[in-house]
Swiss-Prot record:
Gene source species: Homo sapiens
GO CC annotation: T cell receptor complex
Role noted for this protein: V region of the variable domain of T cell receptor (TR) alpha chain that participates in the antigen recognition. Alpha-beta T cell receptors are antigen specific receptors which are essential to the immune response and are present on the cell surface of T lymphocytes. Recognize peptide-major histocompatibility (MH) (pMH) complexes that are displayed by antigen presenting cells (APC), a prerequisite for efficient T cell adaptive immunity against pathogens.
Compartments it resides in: Cell membrane
Chain segments annotated as transmembrane: none
Assembly: Alpha-beta TR is a heterodimer composed of an alpha and beta chain; disulfide-linked. The alpha-beta TR is associated with the transmembrane signaling CD3 coreceptor proteins to form the TR-CD3 (TcR or TCR). The assembly of alpha-beta TR heterodimers with CD3 occurs in the endoplasmic reticulum where a single alpha-beta TR heterodimer associates with one CD3D-CD3E heterodimer, one CD3G-CD3E heterodimer and one CD247 homodimer forming a stable octameric structure. CD3D-CD3E and CD3G-CD3E heterodimers preferentially associate with TR alpha and TR beta chains, respectively.
Glycosylation sites: 86
Major site of localization recorded for this protein: membrane
Gene encoding the protein: TRAV13-1
UniProt keyword annotation of Chloroplast present: no
Keywords noted in UniProt: Adaptive immunity, Cell membrane, Disulfide bond, Glycoprotein, Immunity, Immunoglobulin domain, Membrane, Receptor, Signal, T cell receptor
GO biological processes: adaptive immune response; response to bacterium
Domain Ig-like: 21-112
Protein name: T cell receptor alpha variable 13-1
Length: 112
């Protein structure tokens, strides 16, 4: 029998209340098959935002910065993880390729 392993990616909405920034994350939950790609999108409200980090929080651990991007860059890659930014549309996305079981975590974005 073939075993199908699913990678569960749980998402968290991060609101940057210090700067009054509202950030919305879509989808709220995501499940993909091992080896597939996953994309998580965030939209933000303040066009003055210039720093866009993504965090990963594994069960029982604190959040860890996994990748970030500045407003003067459209795309940044680090191994299987990439982030893209569209300042005009006010959204940025986290892309994870070739998902693995260790990718199962809570992911959240912020903007400042």
């Amino acid at each position: 029998m073939t075993s199908i392993r699913a990678v569960f990616i749980f998402l968290w909405l991060q609101l940057d209340l210090v700067n009054g920034e509202n950030v919305e994350q879509h989808p709220s939950t995501l499940s993909v098959q091992e080896g597939d790609s996953a994309v998580i999108k965030c939209t933000y409200s303040d066009s003055a935002s210039n720093y866009f980090p993504w965090y990963k929080q594994e069960l029982g651990k604190g959040p860890q910065l996994i990748i970030d991007i500045r407003s003067n860059v459209g795309e940044k890659k680090d191994q299987r993880i990439a982030v893209t930014l569209n300042k005009t549309a006010k959204h940025f996305s986290l892309h994870i390729t070739e998902t693995q079981p260790e990718d199962s975590a809570v992911y959240f974005c912020a903007a400042s």
